[in-house]
Amino acid sequence: MAQLETRTEPMVVNFGPHHPSMHGVLRLVVTLDGENVIDCEPVIGYLHRGMEKIAENRTNVMYVPYVSRMDYAAGMFYEAIVVNAPERLANIVVPKRASYIRVLMLELNRIANHLLWLGPFLADVGAQTPFFYIFREREMIYDLWEAATGQRLINNNFFRIGGVACDLPYGWLEKCIDFCDWFAPKIDEYEKLITNNPIFKKRIEGLGTIERDQAINWSLSGPMLRASGVSWDLRKVDSYECYDDFEWEIASEKEGDCYARYRVRVQEMRQSLKIIRQACEMIPGGPTENLEAKRMATEDKKSEIFGMDYQYVAKKVAPTFKIPNGELYTRLESGKGEIGVFIQGNNEVTPWRFKIRAADLNNLQILPHILKGAKIADIMAILGSIDVIMGSVDR
């Protein structure tokens, strides 16, 4: 009996740029053989706004409000890196109290970032309920930010060259500790609901596996790198701000799959709580109301309570602050990985060159590699595990 010859042709499918699971205006041109992915080409640039060129035409004080719009889930991190670069270039020393306040804001932002990753990621793989839980917790972080900076999600405009815009308000540290006490059991609740859920584990275990050597060769960072067995965290490696004062551990896993990346982010939320608690207890001068009372009761103006480390800003930088001649690259660990700034000054109020390294752009580059051989139904789970925000990818 003669057999009919069957012939299959690859099919090209466009995901995005306005797909509900795209995490922004990202377009994936996917080539399929049946249900198997044989090629993937990410198309980026839909949200390009020229943030680097804007930086080169603004003073630092003018530019800080812009940067939180790059990654709306990590606004504090971008504010920090934008002021860290000229600080290091000009050798400006930040008071210890201001450094502690910065750490508090950064770690709250890390928790908020991971929460905003967790909800949509679980929705992508079919678990809708936790999506509503994460906004309950984020609301408390928003309240803390609003009390300290006046804004909630973006445009906090809180970091300054030499410190922060203002000291913490009365009762803020107490409210922050209350949040830690309230949020710690919520992480346990997430773990009971998700971590050992057989449906969830079956859905994402073994997906998007990245080996240790691959993670290093592709210049991955953050949870993407640590989930592949590399214990690399810039808070430990570079010891910026005052992270050396705290006891905490680097969260890492060895499997390198979507499930390992989930585990790393959950562990990081626990470690961030540990850092926040220590910072609230160890901040020089204690709560603002106590610090002001001590200053009023101290007649000796040379007392350490009036010293540099008890201030919230080292020096009021003038709007005409000139960035010194020279160049350097500075970096920090955000919720997504390493973000950095290469700055080149020429003794003018605006930088001559301002290059931004976004963590999620570098992490996104490995997507075509790990999608090859995967099923079409797994594309969204693998993409979601990377954690990209297109505002910072495109800049």
From Swiss-Prot:
GO molecular function per UniProt: NAD binding; oxidoreductase activity, acting on NAD(P)H, quinone or similar compound as acceptor; quinone binding
Keywords: Membrane, NAD, NADP, Plastoquinone, Quinone, Thylakoid, Translocase, Transport
tRNA processing among keywords: no
Membrane topology value: Peripheral membrane protein
InterPro entries, sorted: NADH_Q_OxRdtase_suD, NADH_UbQ_OxRdtase_49kDa_CS, NDH1_su_D/H, NiFe-Hase_large
EC number: 7.1.1.-
tRNA processing is among the record's keywords: no
GO biological process assignments: photosynthesis, light reaction
One Gene Ontology cellular component annotation held by this UniProt entry: plasma membrane-derived thylakoid membrane
Pfam families in the record: Complex1_49kDa (PF00346)
Compartment(s) where it occurs, according to its Swiss-Prot or TrEMBL record: Cellular thylakoid membrane
Catalysis performed (reactions): a plastoquinone + NADH + (n+1) H(+)(in) = a plastoquinol + NAD(+) + n H(+)(out); a plastoquinone + NADPH + (n+1) H(+)(in) = a plastoquinol + NADP(+) + n H(+)(out)
UniProt function note: NDH-1 shuttles electrons from an unknown electron donor, via FMN and iron-sulfur (Fe-S) centers, to quinones in the respiratory and/or the photosynthetic chain. The immediate electron acceptor for the enzyme in this species is believed to be plastoquinone. Couples the redox reaction to proton translocation, and thus conserves the redox energy in a proton gradient. Cyanobacterial NDH-1 also plays a role in inorganic carbon-concentration.
Subunit organization: NDH-1 can be composed of about 15 different subunits; different subcomplexes with different compositions have been identified which probably have different functions.
Family named by the database record: Belongs to the complex I 49 kDa subunit family.
Protein name as it appears in the record: NAD(P)H-quinone oxidoreductase subunit H
Gene that encodes it: ndhH
